[in-house]
Swiss-Prot record:
GO terms for biological process: 3'-phosphoadenosine 5'-phosphosulfate metabolic process; post-translational protein modification. This is Protein-tyrosine sulfotransferase 1. Catalyzes the O-sulfation of tyrosine residues within acidic motifs of polypeptides, using 3'-phosphoadenylyl sulfate (PAPS) as cosubstrate. Residues 1-8 are cytoplasmic. It comes from Homo sapiens (Human).
Amino acid sequence: MVGKLKQNLLLACLVISSVTVFYLGQHAMECHHRIEERSQPVKLESTRTTVRTGLDLKANKTFAYHKDMPLIFIGGVPRSGTTLMRAMLDAHPDIRCGEETRVIPRILALKQMWSRSSKEKIRLDEAGVTDEVLDSAMQAFLLEIIVKHGEPAPYLCNKDPFALKSLTYLSRLFPNAKFLLMVRDGRASVHSMISRKVTIAGFDLNSYRDCLTKWNRAIETMYNQCMEVGYKKCMLVHYEQLVLHPERWMRTLLKFLQIPWNHSVLHHEEMIGKAGGVSLSKVERSTDQVIKPVNVGALSKWVGKIPPDVLQDMAVIAPMLAKLGYDPYANPPNYGKPDPKIIENTRRVYKGEFQLPDFLKEKPQTEQVE
């Protein structure tokens, strides 16, 4: 009896062992097959054609977004009219820009840091993270952020001021993209950032001299890259001329972007908070200004605010002023005569007709632009 029990136990163990060996063998073959599949070279073509789709429920349309689409990038030194520019474009029914992402310039700066460090580049290459791999990843990442941080639209634009420090790189990633470089009198930009306490990485808000030096360096970098990609891809937009003659400049600008004219771009203030209109952030410093129609109230606020020693050295501190067409010794320069409609807008603004809507009333946090 005991002997028979031992035989049965031995037989059961043998069956279990056989089944286990068979299962492990099948599993090993499957793993080997998967490893072989993974070892096959990846078709780079598939990684280069990342497509995102967006559904516009109101218009019942689906849009396909990809690296070859005509993206629009708006940039410049902060306090140069980039928010006004994007608000005017956002008022166009076919264009969506939206608020600053803050992510895009940071990831671009990180990529620049990797490229500049020869040691880091060697490490990345050794790890198989080549320029081609990084570029493909950057394309997908940037497109994902631009597409998904707002509503779908036929044309998408991004407004992160310092993103244009990587203008030539963006032009390579998105070959059909176009760039709008906002240019403003550096004295006005610097006075605005100091008086409104807009913290910008590397700018000492206690020193007009330091801020003007940093302004000069930043705008020179972006201007040179704009010139490098050429006038067919990058357009300089002077803030002063945009607010003095908005219709003339918006018609020129939309023609450059190859987007049909729409009169709503001249009345962005009427589209704020509306579906498909202008979405504003409660914490961006320019929000309280772009709720107003285009006006010339901010053109010469800097006059009388800059220390005399800085004014005296202006041409040396900020040589880009002259290069961009501003007289470094005129206080203020003669920017030009505004259109009649702009004179009326400015009168209404001074009367206090335009106040911040309740849904945008929140004390802004200290904003740092990088």
